[in-house]
């Protein structure tokens, strides 16, 4: 992790591409630091490192049944792919792609993270990963349903998976907080 001690009242920001902080799973020292009052900000694809890691509050699936359903659907897709044609591979890839979609995010504008905004915010969605809502903490920005896609290209398979997904939120961890922002919010 880090060779220096970080005071508990500090903040660490982990952005997309900042892999030197966390290589695979977040180290125990990072969780200890957050639990002691630190604030960790995780942005974009960096969130993948925190999925299903104990103490960080970010899950890949809403429930065990949702996880089983996703695995069944993935297996069905793999079986269908056996019959696909080589010439259609690029077109097939588009079904699961996001190339910059403008989405309408519903906000809890009573939370400090969204203070001053209306009840919605338009976000540039660049990541195809969709996260379920946090079970502990605050779900401040939520992608409600497929009609939330306002403009741009989003593959139909990703679009149909949109159902109350986290865009940004805050996980309360003992004395500290982990702030998740799934895409760059500077749009």
Language-model region placement:
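Catalytic beta-strand/loop cores that center a nucleophilic Ser/Cys/Thr
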Residues: 81-187
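Cysteine-nucleophile active-site neighborhood
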Residues: 29-77, 84-86, 93
């Amino acid at each position: 992790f880090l060779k220096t001690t970080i005071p508990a009242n500090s903040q660490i920001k982990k952005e997309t591409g900042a892999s030197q902080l966390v290589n695979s799973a977040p180290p125990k020292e990072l969780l200890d630091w957050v639990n002691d009052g630190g604030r960790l900000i995780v942005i974009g694809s960096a969130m993948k490192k925190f999925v299903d890691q104990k103490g960080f509050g970010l899950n890949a699936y809403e429930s065990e049944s949702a996880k089983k359903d996703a695995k069944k659907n993935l297996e069905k897709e793999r079986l269908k792919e056996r019959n696909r044609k080589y010439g259609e591979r690029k077109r097939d890839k588009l079904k699961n792609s996001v190339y910059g979609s403008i989405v309408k995010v519903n906000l809890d504008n009573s939370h400090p993270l969204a203070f001053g905004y209306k009840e919605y915010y338009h976000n540039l969605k660049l990541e195809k990963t969709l996260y379920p809502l946090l079970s502990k903490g605050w779900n401040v920005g939520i992608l409600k349903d497929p009609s939330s896609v306002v403009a741009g290209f989003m593959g139909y398979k990703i679009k149909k998976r949109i159902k109350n997904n986290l865009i940004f939120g805050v996980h309360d961890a003992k004395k500290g907080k982990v702030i998740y922002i799934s895409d760059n919010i500077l749009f």
